[in-house]
Each structure stands twice: as C-alpha cells, then as structure tokens.
Amino acid sequence: MAVGKNKRLTKGGKKGAKKKIVDPFSKKDWYDVKAPAMFNIRNLGKTLVTRTQGTKIASDGLKGRVFEVSLADLQNDEVAFRKFKLITEDVQGKNCLTNFHGMDLTRDKMCSMVKKWQTMIEAHVDVKTTDGYLLRLFCVGFTKKRNNQIRKTSYAQHQQVRQIRKKMFEIMTREVQTNDLKEVVNKLIPDSIGKDIEKACQSIYPLHDVYVRKVKMLKKPKFELGKLMELHGEGGGTGKPAGDETGAKVERADGYEPPVQESV
C-alpha cells in the first residue's frame, strides 16, 4: 500500500456528514377521527398524514384508512371484548368521517369461552341490508347444563346441533335483511341478535355465551356523501344552504339615485 494522504478523507470528511437531518413529522398533519352518530363517544382520536404536495393530496391518503376501536371506548362502557372496525370514507376540513367496516371479538374472550364437556356450535351467513351493504356474519354458541342435570357433560346430539344452526341462520338473516346498516350496527352494539338466538334455542338445547363473534364487510354500494353526513348527524348534505338565503326586494323612495363616489 502506498504511503500518503487519503484524498477522500481530507476532501469531504466523513461520508454523509453533510446530509441535513429533516424531521419527518414536520411534513405531516394531525386529523381528528370521528365515529358515526350511533356511538356515544364521537371523537376517537387523531391520525397522521403527509401534507398535500403537488399531485399527492392528503385527503386521498386518509380515505380507506381503517381504525379498530374497542366498544368500551366508543360507548364509555365496561364491556371491552367487542372491537369495531371503522373506515374513513370522507375528509371534511380536519375531520375524518368514518363508517362501519366490521366487528370482531377479542382473542382472549374467544379462548375463555371454549371449554371441555360442552358442544360448540358455529354458523355463518351472507346477508344484504336494505341499503345495499353485503355482510358476512359469524355466530358462535355453547351448550350448557340443564337445571336438574347431574351428568358432568352437556353434549348436544348432531340433529340438535343442526336445528340450532338453522335457527342461527334464520335469525341472523331476518335481523339484517329487514334493516339498513345503521340499524344493524345498533343491534350489534348490545348484541341483541345473540340474545334472540339464545332465547329461540332454549327449547332445542339450553345455550350460553351466544355471540355474533365477527362481521365482515363484503360489498358496499356506491359512496354517497349525503348518506355519510346523515350517519354523522349533520343533515342530508343536499348542497343547499342551511338558512333561507334567497334575496329580498328592497323598497326605495321614488327618484332615488346612488351617491357619486370620488374614487373607486
């Protein structure tokens, strides 16, 4: 190796030393995430997005963003095992307006329900709401001991399982087919569908822990801003002003002429 100065080191110093460190958060903005009006707590939190630069618009980066929120945070409630998915459909100012996108039970709740000495019955069905949303609902239920039962196990016969599954199909289909998405979500919040199934199946075999464990959004109708604004309780969004903004005729005295202005 030749003895001498290393030109690279003396000329430019260390490689990459001149690079200016830019804080990535300086190019981003915070947006508020708003839940639909069927939930008690509307303000979910905030989300980050890169500011509008040239053809890259900030609102386009927010649309389609999915947030998973516990029902306890949405309803200010103790029941925390149900999670709702909300998708951003439109951006108004600094607010992201969301809509229902799915529901799920937490992993620990599902694991706590599965036990020995009982039969687990599951069913799923694809149903369309009156306003054109195609949902896939998954239901789960477990058999329980009868009041006067001494035997340790409470296994249902195959025929009873089929009858219970049929009831699950019927009730889930009926509850969703006859309602729009808003009413379906209002039924999912207290899980009234699961309670109806439990009540209807008592004559076949007593059940407990009956839940709609998951809801998937399969298809959506064409996006309409008016419907989204209705979900958020902000009117129909027809584009007309809120007050009566029509002009009124002004009465003036005969021979009235406007004063001549010196400068315009």
UniProtKB/Swiss-Prot annotation:
GO CC entries: cytosol; cytosolic small ribosomal subunit; nucleolus; small-subunit processome
Pfam families membership: Ribosomal_S3Ae
Database matches in InterPro entries: Ribosomal_eS1, Ribosomal_eS1_CS, Ribosomal_eS1_euk
Origin: domain of life: Eukaryota
Localisation: Cytoplasm; Nucleus; Nucleus, Nucleolus
Chief location: cytoplasm
Metal-binding listed as a keyword: no
UniProt keyword list: Cytoplasm, Nucleus, Ribonucleoprotein, Ribosomal protein
An annotated GO BP: ribosomal small subunit biogenesis
Region annotation (Disordered) ranges: 233-264
GO molecular function annotations of the record: structural constituent of ribosome
Basic and acidic residues bias (residue ranges): 242-255
PROSITE patterns according to UniProt: RIBOSOMAL_S3AE
Disulfide bonds: none
The protein's role, per its UniProt record: Component of the small ribosomal subunit. The ribosome is a large ribonucleoprotein complex responsible for the synthesis of proteins in the cell. Part of the small subunit (SSU) processome, first precursor of the small eukaryotic ribosomal subunit. During the assembly of the SSU processome in the nucleolus, many ribosome biogenesis factors, an RNA chaperone and ribosomal proteins associate with the nascent pre-rRNA and work in concert to generate RNA folding, modifications, rearrangements and cleavage as well as targeted degradation of pre-ribosomal RNA by the RNA exosome.
Family of this protein: Belongs to the eukaryotic ribosomal protein eS1 family.
HAMAP family associated with the record: Ribosomal_eS1_euk
Record's subunit section: Component of the small ribosomal subunit. Mature ribosomes consist of a small (40S) and a large (60S) subunit. The 40S subunit contains about 33 different proteins and 1 molecule of RNA (18S). The 60S subunit contains about 49 different proteins and 3 molecules of RNA (28S, 5.8S and 5S). Part of the small subunit (SSU) processome, composed of more than 70 proteins and the RNA chaperone small nucleolar RNA (snoRNA) U3.
Protein name as catalogued: Small ribosomal subunit protein eS1A
Organism: Xenopus laevis (African clawed frog)
